[in-house]
């Protein structure tokens, strides 16, 4: 069965659904790494992707954005000239009430009876003004870091802005 579109899980209300010890069959988190690049060197400029709306970001979207930005930085800047961090973790478990389709589905399906749903993935709850990714670079690679953030932002289900958190005086 096909995955449901991300817009179905974008908005949230009610308490978080995160207690995996009470659930069975929760899929693993797709985000492979949360820290990339040169983790030891102190770099002077920090560029952060900040969301403009409160929403949920599925782990698929986080991983797609992470891969996009990291690959761009790795190819254009080099592994030793940046540090990239994913600042949110997809704790929220997403559920789906699977519906049978096709011939005879009405005999097999329960419809909306017992419609709690099964775990199909995870998402990170982010709030307006929260940072999702941060890249630390030197002055020479500042524009490339901004471009990497732009590429990552296109993979997210919410409007975003790129903010210089540290070293703003170096890039003026």
From Swiss-Prot:
Protein name in the entry: Large ribosomal subunit protein uL16
SUPFAM superfamilies referenced in this protein's UniProt entry, alphabetically: Ribosomal protein L16p/L10e
CDD domains (alphabetical): Ribosomal_L16_L10e (cd01433)
PANTHER family according to UniProt: 60S RIBOSOMAL PROTEIN L10
UniProt source species: Methanocella arvoryzae (strain DSM 22066 / NBRC 105507 / MRE50)
GO cellular component terms attached to this protein's record: ribonucleoprotein complex; ribosome
Keywords, comma-separated and alphabetical: Ribonucleoprotein, Ribosomal protein
Transmembrane segments: none
Family: Belongs to the universal ribosomal protein uL16 family.
């Amino acid at each position: 069965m096909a995955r449901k579109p991300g817009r179905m899980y974008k908005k949230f209300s009610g308490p978080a659904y995160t207690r995996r010890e009470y659930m069975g069959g929760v899929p693993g988190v797709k985000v492979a790494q949360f820290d990339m690049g040169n983790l030891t060197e102190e770099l002077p400029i920090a560029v952060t992707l900040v969301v403009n709306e409160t929403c949920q970001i599925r782990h698929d979207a986080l991983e797609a954005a992470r891969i996009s930005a990291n690959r761009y930085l790795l190819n254009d800047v080099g592994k030793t000239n940046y540090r990239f961090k994913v600042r949110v973790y997809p704790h929220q478990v997403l559920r789906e009430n699977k519906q049978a389709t096709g011939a005879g589905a009405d005999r097999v399906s329960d419809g909306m009876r017992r419609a709690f749903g099964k775990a199909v993935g995870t998402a990170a709850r982010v709030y307006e003004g929260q940072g999702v990714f941060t890249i630390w670079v030197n002055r020479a690679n500042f524009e490339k870091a901004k471009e990497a953030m732009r590429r990552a932002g296109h993979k997210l289900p919410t409007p975003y802005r790129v903010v210089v958190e540290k070293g703003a005086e170096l890039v003026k």
